[in-house]
A protein has these predicted regions:
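Charged (Asp/Glu and Lys/Arg) segments that form or flank catalytic channels of large polymer-
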Residues: 2-232
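Terminal interaction-prone segments of large eukaryotic proteins
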Residues: 178, 182-502
Length: 502
């Protein structure tokens, strides 16, 4: 069945609902590429199925099994020769012919050199799919795995800290941990323990592993603060007499990576020209090579060169964050299964399915409009405050609901106590959320506003002064974003500004 032409008829309503589907892509990590497209991945001499002229050179990074990971030294998109879908099918079918004629050892080397593994029922060997599936068009890299899962960020930050230690600043891990501890993240991020990634014996573990070991979400949360630390602290070490050497090349390489990450994140909220992303990626790769050479560039560095093409094809950059979080549900129920039997998998599947059906049956399961999350009737004290602030009549009290959390766009929510940016005339202003409420069904947020003291746009760093005893109420959809902030000793507030608002 070709769903792009015939669709599928679903039995809803009197006449039913017909859905058509066109395959957009497979968002995958490297391991999934091996299962679906039979790529040999990082262990192959030719580690990218999409590039015909890219082969490995031995790296200095040793994997846990003792084998050398591969490095990539092609740093420009224009220097790559792109493979076609027909090229991939020819390779798969060439292996199909050779498997019956080549000795096992020779066939293994052939697969290694071509970057593809032969499997009897491989997707690329299914002739029926030739007219429906274009592998090159639907082959996608997941930027989350590329950058944050033993990826580009983990290696680059590790190498930067090692460079700082070599020039004489031996306590950089401890100082960085203390610096992170001064910052606060939006409630949804759970950033209170991020400083622990670099504290205590974690330093030894990172250095033994030759990369920073942390969860992908934690790595993403750290990018902004780490960038400011590099700009304000590491780039000034020699000038302040703390080191004899200089590590500016390494610092600028990390900052170039941070720019790439900021562009990727911003692409989900604002239009981003693919060329802009490609330019930033190529700049980072060149600066990384200047700082540390190509020997540390694993295939995930090469993945970055393909991201702009994915943005061009789909108009956005998909990632696996939400898919990875889905692992929590089966883990939650699998932990409680004590009787390992032939039906334990079925039991687990039933538990997970019931869990998801329970979530889907909730009335707000697909509620993405602006408004309160799990709102409830406001207390009398809250009613009195809002009636006074909004100059309402006493009859409005019955319509007032409140919550500590509210959705301000289809993409995000914010909590009471979060520092936010909100629309103010032609620009934006910062403030802290005091309460979220609804009055006559209209979502409203009470804000303690800040006045701008200083804004360093290139750094994305700003200083604000809280306005004392002056709260304002805004419609919740006027909130632009939640931000990372730090409360300074003099009462001012340091705020990191997202790239799209600089």
């Amino acid at each position: 069945m070709n769903l792009a032409l015939t669709g599928v008829l679903l039995p809803f309503g009197d006449s039913g609902v017909r859905l058509w589907a066109k395959l957009g892509g497979f968002i995958q990590d490297g391991g999934a590429h091996k299962f679906v497209w039979h790529s040999r991945g990082d262990g192959a001499s030719k580690f990218c199925l999409l590039c015909k002229n890219l082969f490995d050179q031995e790296s200095e990074i040793v994997d846990e099994d003792g084998s050398n990971l591969l490095s990539c030294d092609v740093l420009k998109w224009d220097e790559l020769v792109q493979a076609s879908s027909n090229d991939l099918r020819k390779t798969a079918r060439y292996l199909e012919r050779k498997v019956v004629t080549e000795p096992p050892a020779a066939f293994l080397l052939l697969q290694q050199s071509l970057g593809m593994t032969y499997h009897k029922h491989a997707l690329l060997l299914n002739r029926y799919l030739d007219d429906y599936v274009s592998p090159v068009e639907v082959y996608l890299h997941d930027w989350m795995h590329a950058i944050f899962v033993d990826g580009v960020f983990n290696f680059t930050l590790y190498l930067l800290l090692e460079s700082v230690i070599r020039i004489g600043f031996a306590d950089v891990y401890e100082v960085f941990s203390s610096y992170i501890a001064n910052w606060k993240w939006p409630h949804r991020v759970q950033g209170a323990n991020l400083h622990g990634i670099f504290a205590g014996d974690r330093e030894k573990k990172h250095r033994a592993a030759n990369h920073i070991k942390c969860q992908a979400s934690d790595g993403l949360s750290l990018v902004g603060v780490a960038s400011l630390f590099v700009r304000k602290v590491l780039l000034n070490l020699q000038r302040r007499g703390l080191t004899e050497g200089d590590c500016s090349a390494e610092c600028y390489a990390f900052l170039a990576l941070a720019e790439v990450v900021e562009l990727i994140v911003a692409s989900s909220r604002i239009p981003l020209p693919p060329k802009t992303l490609l330019t930033a990626v190529e700049k980072f790769l060149q600066l990384f090579k200047t700082a540390w050479g190509c020997c540390w560039m694993t295939p995930k560095f090469h993945w970055l060169l393909h991201l702009h093409d994915q943005l061009r094809k789909l108009g956005n950059l998909l990632n696996c964050f939400c898919l990875e979080r889905k692992h929590r549900v089966p883990k939650r129920y699998a932990t409680d299964i004590a009787n390992v039997s032939k039906k334990n998998s079925k039991s687990l599947l039933m538990e997970v399915t019931s869990h998801h059906l329970g979530q889907l049956s909730q009335h707000d399961a697909f509620a993405f409009e602006v408004g309160l999350v799990r709102g409830s009737k406001a207390s009398k004290r809250t009613q009195q405050v809002l009636i006074a602030e909004l100059e309402l009549g006493p009859e409005a009290a019955a319509t007032i609901k409140h919550s500590i959390e509210s959705r301000f766009s289809p993409l995000a929510t914010c909590h009471k106590g979060d520092v936010i940016l909100y629309k103010d005339d032609a620009g934006f202003r910062a403030g802290k959320v005091l309460i979220h409420c609804e009055v006559h069904g209209l979502p409203i947020s009470m804000i303690s506003p800040f006045n701008l003291h200083k804004f360093d746009a290139p750094c994305g760093h700003s200083i604000w002064t809280p306005v004392q005893d002056q709260n304002i109420c805004i419609e919740t959809d006027q909130i632009l974003d939640t931000v990372v902030y730090s409360e300074l000793p003099d009462g001012k507030v340091s705020v990191l500004i997202p790239s799209e608002f600089r």
